[in-house]
């Protein structure tokens, strides 16, 4: 899902949905937009290579977009276990912050907030429409943005997963 958010390309998501729809009906999945820990990029890079997408630069793009490093990015996440050599890292952040509610809210951009809220609701509606058990992690049910106070606690400061555990 977050690949689709960052790239605005639904082809990988469509492929995954097609594969899942062919599985036996007695399979049950837990469906969620984010995890209590972090989001990893276990994407189908063999498929993506058909479109000229290479794993390391693509992971860097996803991480840069979803941490707000691109000027047109609305997302505000943080990396966990960043390994620049491999271009791999895990992503942390609440769904609201990754959808832009945090950025546009702090900027006082009501039009942006409205768009980000629609984005958040759309992603949750998509997740809820999937076969399986929907899981909504702490704070996402109320649109909670990232909590940066973990950085004030020396015991937690080095672990960005506390960003969305608040």
Model regions: which residues?
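Active-site and adjacent substrate-binding regions of carbohydrate-active enzymes
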Residues: 1-166
